[in-house]
Amino acid sequence: MKKIKEAEQRKLRRKKRIKDKIGRGVASRPRITIFKSNRYFYAQVIDDSRGHTVVSISTIEKSLNLSKNIDDIKKLGEVLAKRLKEKNINNLIFDRNGYKYHGLIASFATSLREFGINI
């Protein structure tokens, strides 16, 4: 039990440190935030100045039919990049939400970069 609490506290400290460094997203450069559950992967692009979600995507969408593995997360990044291009958004602030930058998070960010989104 103690190890779980310590891990949670470390994640919260990482999350706060990241938020302090990246700041807030604006209309010209919105913030993309990530959330992982045990089963699904979610990403949403947020304009913090208006408090609105500009674009969101997840593996739970029926039309995508994706699971939570690295290959499908790369496809998710590709689809999100296309949706962002439709809305003329090319620059983002990447908020990894306290998660370590490896595995799914890293492959998602790399996929966005490969399809022309500046992070």
UniProtKB/Swiss-Prot annotation:
The keyword Ribonucleoprotein appears for this protein: yes
Annotated stretches, region: Disordered: 1-20
GO BP of this protein: translation
Domain of life, per lineage: Bacteria
Keywords: Ribonucleoprotein, Ribosomal protein, RNA-binding, rRNA-binding
Any one GO cellular component localisation term in the record: ribosome
InterPro entries per UniProt: Ribosomal_uL18_bac-type, Ribosomal_uL18_bac/euk
Single GO term (MF): 5S rRNA binding
Biased composition (Basic and acidic residues): 1-10
Pfam family, any one: Ribosomal_L18p
Quaternary structure note: Part of the 50S ribosomal subunit; part of the 5S rRNA/L5/L18/L25 subcomplex. Contacts the 5S and 23S rRNAs.
Role description: This is one of the proteins that bind and probably mediate the attachment of the 5S RNA into the large ribosomal subunit, where it forms part of the central protuberance.
Entry's family note: Belongs to the universal ribosomal protein uL18 family.
Name the UniProt record assigns to this protein: Large ribosomal subunit protein uL18
Gene that encodes the chain: rplR
